[in-house]
């Protein structure tokens, strides 16, 4: 698949046996595009990200990005995480506890200098000398995002990137990511449990249920939400 920037984006077919079901998902994401993965807890969303990152290995299928295969089961090809050119913001953040915020970002930089600019872009430049345990969960989340972007990835994988952020900082990060995408053609695959975000987002949304793409699941959630908003209150008004 080829995006508007003239470079091939992500095309993958992931099949992986899990404890209670088999993940079987076709996924595409063009350069400069964001794809949201949503669905009930335990439906295979994080496993999908881990397979794309190379941390988990699919039982069968393929992962193709930027004109090359990262994984191809039929030939046994499997490129490791360090050679995929990806950024991965996991729920655990992945910051080094003995390093300052700035040192964590600098560690991921391909070129010397520039860590402060990343931190300033997400509003935490004043925390650059703090260590992860000295800042809040939302601040750690933003520091980890900077770390993920510092290596200038071609594909960014985000697992609940806004979960610890307030509304103001969510908007700040969304605008920052949009600017990065516009400048670089970065492809983003993001997991969200925020139903409102999934239902109102302008980007493409894939709902997963028991490892399968489930567009009906998202429509059921939309219908339930609308029904709740239309339900009469005790005073006779609607929500």
Residue ranges and their predicted role:
Residues 68-73, 112-128, 178-179:
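Conserved ABC ATPase "signature" region
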Residues 70-88:
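ABC ATPase NBD coupling module
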Residues 131-135, 139-141:
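Conserved ABC ATPase signature
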Residues 150-154:
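A short, proline-enriched helix->beta-strand linker immediately N-terminal to the Walker B motif
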Residues 156-160:
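Catalytic Walker B motif of ABC-type/P-loop ATPase nucleotide-binding domains
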Residues 167-169:
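Helix N-cap at the start of a conserved alpha-helix in ABC-type nucleotide-binding domains
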Residues 185-191:
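Conserved H-loop
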């Amino acid at each position: 698949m080829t995006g508007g920037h003239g470079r091939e984006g992500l095309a993958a077919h992931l099949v992986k046996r899990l404890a209670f079901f088999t993940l079987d998902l076709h996924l595409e994401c063009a350069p400069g595009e964001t794809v949201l993965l949503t669905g009930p807890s335990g439906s295979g969303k994080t496993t999908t990200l881990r397979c794309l990152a190379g941390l988990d290995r699919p039982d069968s299928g393929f992962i193709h990005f930027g004109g090359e295969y990262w994984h191809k089961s039929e030939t046994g090809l499997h490129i490791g995480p360090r050679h995929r050119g990806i950024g991965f913001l996991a729920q655990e953040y992945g910051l080094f506890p003995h390093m300052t915020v700035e040192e964590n970002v600098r560690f991921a930089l391909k070129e010397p200098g520039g860590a402060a600019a990343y931190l300033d872009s997400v509003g935490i430049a004043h925390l650059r000398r703090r260590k992860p345990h000295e800042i809040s969960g939302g601040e750690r989340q933003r520091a980890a995002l900077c770390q993920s972007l510092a290596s200038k990835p071609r594909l960014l994988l985000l697992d609940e990137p806004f979960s610890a952020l307030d509304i103001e900082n969510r908007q700040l990060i969304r605008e920052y990511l949009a600017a990065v995408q516009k400048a670089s053609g970065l492809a983003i695959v993001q997991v969200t449990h925020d139903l409102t975000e999934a239902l109102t987002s302008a980007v493409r949304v894939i709902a997963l249920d028991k490892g399968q793409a489930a567009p009906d699941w998202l429509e059921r959630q939309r219908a339930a939400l609308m029904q709740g908003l239309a339900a009469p209150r005790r005073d006779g008004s609607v929500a």
